[in-house]
Curated annotation (Swiss-Prot):
Subunit comment: Heterotetramer of two alpha and two beta subunits.
Positions of substrate binding: 264, 321-323
GO biological process: succinyl-CoA metabolic process; tricarboxylic acid cycle
Protein family membership: Belongs to the succinate/malate CoA ligase beta subunit family.
Species: Sodalis glossinidius (strain morsitans)
Record Gene3D superfamilies: ATP-grasp fold, A domain, ATP-grasp fold, B domain, Succinyl-CoA synthetase domains
Identification of the protein by name: Succinate--CoA ligase [ADP-forming] subunit beta
EC number(s) per entry: 6.2.1.5
Signal peptide extent: none
Example of a GO cellular component annotation carried by this entry: cytosol
Any GO molecular function: ATP binding
Keyword Transit peptide attributed: no
Cofactors that this protein relies on: Mg(2+)
């Protein structure tokens, strides 16, 4: 679950991280009043959306007059911002952030992630701030410095100082960076975060460190014990189908293709999408119905998949372990009948009672194609989309 920049900076302030003074505004009046609260300009106005690339799309602007703040608010509030990270429709702009402009001497990068390889929370820092860290990692990986936190001892001030020295910081900047390091580590661990990015972390003209931007992503599996973060969730920034699937405890991610995929198991779902691509198809989604592929869950999954107008066919790939494939077949038949599926449905069943399940699908009289293997399923669904 992603947070807005202004929400990230609110949390930064609680954990002692320095950030520019600013206010999130929902109306034109609030935007104008915020400038008076901050004091003399110049100011920076930023659209609040869950996407990067705002500046290149006109969603971030430095202004010197209050009239410019009002004009920016009129331009964007209630509109949609399209960036290279959004789809063609863009993301709705419901708030803008007005904050004091910062005198920037140098830009750094600081991020925190969970490294699955080392099973540690890892800090990443670089002197190449203000650009995408993925680009830095690809072109100049030696400029990224890493520190892993020991789960027993937790973050240590000396680790922050080590990173500061590697970034070329000196004097008061070392102690400032160490404080940011410790505060950010505490924030990450206490709030069950999955990702933090401060890009850029800037050195001001006076030589101080300021968190100029903030991106926070919370671990969705831990939200049950983070009520405050749950309240910060902005559903308007999420795909409606994905949000609905989350409420039903279905793992759904919308994609750009036209072949709907329904699978039990995340690994099998990724493999299914791969083989669809291999045979020339384009997946419309990732959808994992989980281990309990009941009729109710399959029905809701069909509804979500078919709410995407791009879907021209559906591939159902189920591996029956403890769950019996004949019962799953009954669920698929019931779901197809109830939902009124009008596109071809290709089903591949494997495992417990797979043959009986395939027979029930064949005898159902519905527009369901029983595949004999995963390769056959992929070929059949691609052919169905192409009208062959």
């Amino acid at each position: 679950m992603n947070l807005h920049e202004y929400q990230a900076k609110q949390l930064f302030a609680r954990y002692g991280l320095p950030a520019p003074t600013g206010y999130a505004c929902n109306t034109l009046r609030e935007a104008e009043e915020s400038a008076s609260k901050i004091g003399a300009g110049p100011w920076v106005v930023k659209c609040q959306v869950h996407a990067g690339g705002r500046g290149k799309s006109g969603g971030v602007k430095v202004v010197k007059l209050k009239e410019e703040i009002r004009a920016f608010a009129e331009q964007w509030l209630g509109k949609r911002l399209v960036t290279y990270q959004t789809d063609a429709l863009g993301q709705p702009v419901n708030q803008i952030l007005v904050e004091v402009a910062t005198d920037i001497a140098k830009e750094l990068y600081l991020g925190v992630v969970v490294d699955r390889g080392t099973r540690r929370v890892v800090f990443m820092a670089s002197t190449e701030g203000g650009v995408e860290i993925e680009k830095v990692a690809e072109e100049t990986p030696h400029l990224i410095h890493k520190v892993a936190l020991d789960p027993l001892t937790g973050p240590q001030p000396y680790q922050g100082r080590e990173l500061a020295f590697k970034l070329g910081l000196s004097g008061k900047q070392v102690s400032q960076f160490s404080k940011i390091f410790m505060g950010l580590a505490t924030l990450f661990l206490e709030r069950d975060l999955a990702l933090v990015e401060i890009n850029p972390l800037v050195i001001t003209g006076a030589g101080d460190l300021i968190c100029l931007d903030g991106k926070l992503s919370a671990d969705g599996n831990a939200l049950f014990r983070q009520p405050e973060l749950r309240e910060m969730r902005d559903h308007s920034q999420e795909d409606e189908r994905e949000a609905h699937a989350t409420q039903l405890e279905l793992n759904y991610v919308a994609l750009d293709g036209n072949i709907g995929c329904m699978v039990n198991g995340a690994g099998l779902a990724m493999g299914t999408m791969d083989i669809v691509k291999l045979h020339g198809g384009e997946p419309a989604n990732f959808l994992d119905v989980g281990g309990g592929a009941t009729k109710e869950r399959v029905t809701e999954a069909f509804k979500i998949i078919l709410s995407d107008e791009k879907v021209k066919a559906v591939l159902v790939n189920i591996f029956g372990g403890i769950v019996r494939c004949d019962l799953i077949a009954d669920g698929i038949i019931g779901a197809v009948s109830e939902v009124g599926v009008s596109v071809p449905v290709v089903v591949r069943l494997e495992g417990n009672n797979a043959e009986l399940g395939a027979k029930r699908l064949a005898d159902s009289g519905l527009n369901i194609i029983a595949a004999t293997s995963l390769t056959d399923a992929a070929q059949q669904v691609v052919a169905a989309v192409e009208g062959k």
